[in-house]
């Protein structure tokens, strides 16, 4: 996710490349980031010093180590902290980051990997922040897709719906593509057909504002092939499987 965010920041127009500093312990990764036109360092403290917004994007079990490692070099009056790590609680972050009774402005953020292509669905939960800071962080992530302000309670649901949801959507694309091959299309052609169909469905909903079921009604004629296909999917638990998968991912 960290690499995807860097790509999104570079492609977006919120921050200039020369103002982006990335910390990574891996030399090959630092070289990759440097080739993208940003500053790369092995030092978390160096990357955090002087930044307006410090984004910590690591595995959940590394968050405490990284935060306590940069806490003493951060300016609590000038900087903001964004933590991207599923399942990490605000109470833990407050425990790790409170310094002399003061807490740095902090946000819990869950994007998805489409952030690299400026198409993320991002959830932002303010932990400690005023209205201006919330607006600034939302503007940052809106340049890399779409973001909504939510509360910590809904981050788990947001993760499975949008972050895990990327994988669920890919699984449908794979299944439909395999079906296309069985129907006689070459694999690459089938994938392209399915991707364009998905894109068209999304655009139709965005432009018209229709409920998905109303859009389905536009293409289901009585006794036609579309309703037969839909009913066969439902007989095999299509909708139920999707909902059960989402609920399982949110546990």
Kindly give the residue locations of the regions a language model identified.
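Short acidic capping loops at alpha-helix termini that bridge into adjacent secondary structure
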Residues: 16-19, 77-79, 188
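Rossmann-like NAD(P)(H) cofactor-binding subdomain of soluble oxidoreductases
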Residues: 36, 44-121
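NAD(P)+-binding Rossmann beta1-loop-alpha1 motif at the extreme N-terminus of oxidoreductases
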Residues: 1-42, 46-50, 119, 181-183
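Small-residue helix-packing motif on alpha-helices
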Residues: 20, 30, 47, 63, ...
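NAD(P)-dependent Rossmann-like dehydrogenase/reductase catalytic/cofactor-binding core
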Residues: 195-251
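Internal alpha-helical scaffold of NAD(P)-dependent oxidoreductase catalytic cores
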Residues: 92, 96-105, 121-157, 168-208
